[in-house]
From Swiss-Prot:
InterPro entries with a match to the protein in the record: Nuc-triphosphatase_THEP1, P-loop_NTPase
Natural source organism: Staphylothermus marinus (strain ATCC 43588 / DSM 3639 / JCM 9404 / F1)
Keywords noted in UniProt: ATP-binding, Hydrolase, Nucleotide-binding
Pfam families: NTPase_1
GO MF terms held by the record: ATP binding; ribonucleoside triphosphate phosphatase activity
PANTHER family, per database record: CANCER-RELATED NUCLEOSIDE-TRIPHOSPHATASE
Protein name (record): Nucleoside-triphosphatase THEP1
């Protein structure tokens, strides 16, 4: 079991690197499951929320919306609990059953407010499948961090100085290593 961890400040390119790695894995015949939660902006470039997307089926729904009424809030964003919980549960269940590699972008305060995410994340972290994990740079949850770091890890902290190089070399490096792990 091995975790590839991507972290860094907001806007540095973590999701770009994650997507690059996932696409490179897929092109090499490796089955990737999991979730990603990209931000959504309106026509003026103003962030209005976050989607949750199943990496295997591409099904998507709202994770959180700006000024959305919800019992669970993170800053100005209300969690769309029913929709996000359903997609998270199904995406991570399928990833555990059918994928060679599990990807999650990201493990952060917003996602961790969702009970289903915490429950499924624990199952993912206990799985022996290789994982590509984007971790919020301020994540301080000891129970989650302990589970992430109890196995072999490669951690990459993205900066302005290394992101271009990492986008060039890391996806292929990970493909070669994962092919050895899963014997594909």
């Amino acid at each position: 079991m091995k975790n590839y961890i991507i972290t860094g400040r907001p806007g540095i390119g973590k999701s770009t690197l994650f997507n690059n790695i996932i696409n490179t894995l897929r092109k090499s015949g490796i089955i990737v499951g999991g979730i990603k939660s990209p931000e959504v902006r309106d026509s003026k470039g103003f962030r209005i929320g976050f989607k949750i997307i199943d990496l295997m089926s591409n099904e998507e729904g709202w994770l959180a919306k700006r000024n959305y009424y919800s019992t669970i809030k993170v800053g100005k964003y209300g969690i769309v609990l029913d929709e996000s919980s359903r997609i998270i549960r199904e995406a991570l269940r399928k990833a555990l059953e059918k994928a060679d590699v599990i990807g999650i972008d990201e493990i952060g305060p917003m996602e961790l407010k969702i009970h289903v995410f915490r429950t499924m994340l624990e199952q993912v972290l206990n799985s022996d499948k290789p994982k590509i994990l984007v971790i919020h740079y301020r994540l301080r949850d000891p129970s989650i961090l302990d589970k992430i770091y109890r196995v072999e890890n490669e951690k990459y902290v993205l900066t302005e100085h290394n992101r271009d190089l990492l986008n060039k070399v890391l996806p292929q490096k990970i493909v070669m290593e994962i092919k050895q792990i899963i014997k594909k």
